[in-house]
Regions:
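Conserved acid/base catalytic micro-environments in cytosolic active-site loops
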Residues: 1-189
């Protein structure tokens, strides 16, 4: 019976005009992307608002990043209780536009990270092109950003591995790492 239903569905798709099929596939992909972004946000929110409080959140994103971020970041309230760092693998020169577009359409402040900048809750900080983004604590226990081109020789700069290792060293169990999209192994070490 299942095979008959599959064959019937295949026959309907085969007779469907290409434009209509493309439009249906596109709308299903958009619905799936929106649902995925909503679920990702709910998981993140449950972790951040749960019994455990995070001092810092890091997001690694690559292929499909601008679209995923465009669905995810607008869901964050201005009252989000931790700063969020983002490493986006993208062709140099495109990141400024993404940051501006997100900042203009979100409740949270979205900006490019600067060296030595105090990281504030309710703000998203992107690693600039060709700079690793790490964090440090000041003597007053504030978290600040550090930008560097070291270590050299990595496939990706900025590197999610470098960011996540820094977060773990500084915040320990009070950090949360999120890998949203991509390819390769950056961020899984």
């Amino acid at each position: 019976m299942a095979r008959l239903l599959t064959n019937a569905a295949s026959a309907r798709v085969a007779r469907m005009p290409v434009r209509e099929l493309a439009a249906r596939i596109s709308s299903m992909r958009d619905a799936l992307d929106s649902e995925t972004a909503r679920r990702d946000f709910e998981v993140l929110q449950s972790h951040v608002n749960g019994a455990r409080r995070f001092d810092i959140v890091g997001v690694a994103i690559s292929t499909g990043g601008p679209n995923a971020l465009g669905r995810f970041v607008p869901l964050l309230p201005a009252s989000f209780p931790a700063p969020i760092l983002v490493v986006q693998h993208i062709i140099p020169g495109f990141l400024d536009g993404i940051v501006k577009r997100l900042n203009d359409s979100c409740e949270v402040a979205v900006r490019m990270a600067e060296n030595g900048q105090q990281l504030e809750p309710g703000a998203v900080y992107f690693a600039p092109d060709k700079k690793h983004l790490t964090i440090a604590r000041t003597p007053q226990k504030k978290i600040i950003s550090k930008l560097s081109d070291k270590p050299e020789g990595l496939l990706f700069c900025p590197s999610a591995d470098v960011m996540f290792k820094s977060m773990a060293a500084v915040a320990g169990s009070r950090c949360l790492g999120v890998i949203m999209t991509g390819m390769g192994h950056d961020g899984v070490e």
